[in-house]
Curated annotation (Swiss-Prot):
Pfam families: Ribosomal_L11, Ribosomal_L11_N. It comes from Methanococcus maripaludis (strain C5 / ATCC BAA-1333). The gene is rpl11. PROSITE patterns: RIBOSOMAL_L11. It comes from the Archaea. InterPro entries: Ribosomal_uL11, Ribosomal_uL11_C, Ribosomal_uL11_C_sf, Ribosomal_uL11_CS, Ribosomal_uL11_N, Ribosomal_uL11_N_sf. This is Large ribosomal subunit protein uL11. Gene3D superfamilies: Ribosomal protein L11, C-terminal domain, Ribosomal protein L11/L12, N-terminal domain.
């Protein structure tokens, strides 16, 4: 069985037969429109976010499977806040403010893909992403929020 794997980032629910998908899948002998339709069906809940997708093509049988990953933490942070982009200058501008409940929600979504051992550390990873997006947590800078977590200020969220 000759399998080819194509990994791409697509906008949720808006994959097209054009680049980057079409040129990568076209030569493998499967119906591109069927692949696009399946990707769009599987990613429609992530509308407007970049979603990692893996298309596994069996070139002998001309069949395919689609695996959808979880969007990057930065995309989940922006969606949770309802903003299109982060701050232009993250150290000098604030694009929004997450609550600890929102941080924990994102951490639970991403936990399987993270290296963190527990929810507390996964939440700290999400807060680390907030640095580059220009988002504060509970009115604190991300670094202050991480220190507050270390000090036990938000332990009630991790039990």
């Amino acid at each position: 069985m000759a399998e080819q794997v194509v990994e791409i980032l697509v906008s949720g629910g808006k994959a097209t037969a054009g680049p980057p998908l079409g040129p990568a899948i076209g030569p493998l002998g499967v119906n591109i429109m069927q692949v696009v339709q399946k990707i769009n069906d599987m990613t429609k809940d992530y509308d407007g976010m970049s979603v990692p997708v893996k298309v596994i093509v069996d070139t002998d049988k001309r069949t395919f499977e689609v695996e959808v990953g979880i969007p990057p933490a930065s995309a989940l942070v922006k969606k949770e806040l309802g903003i299109a982009t982060g701050a232009q200058e993250p150290k000098h501008q604030v694009a929004g403010n997450l609550t600890m409940e929102q941080v924990v929600k994102i951490a639970k979504m991403k936990q399987d893909a993270m290296l963190a051992y527990n929810l507390k550390n996964a939440s700290k990873e999400v807060i680390g992403t907030c640095v580059s997006v220009g988002v504060n947590v509970e009115g604190m800078t991300p670094k202050e929020a991480q220190k507050a977590i270390d000090a036990g200020q938000f332990d009630s969220y991790f039990n």
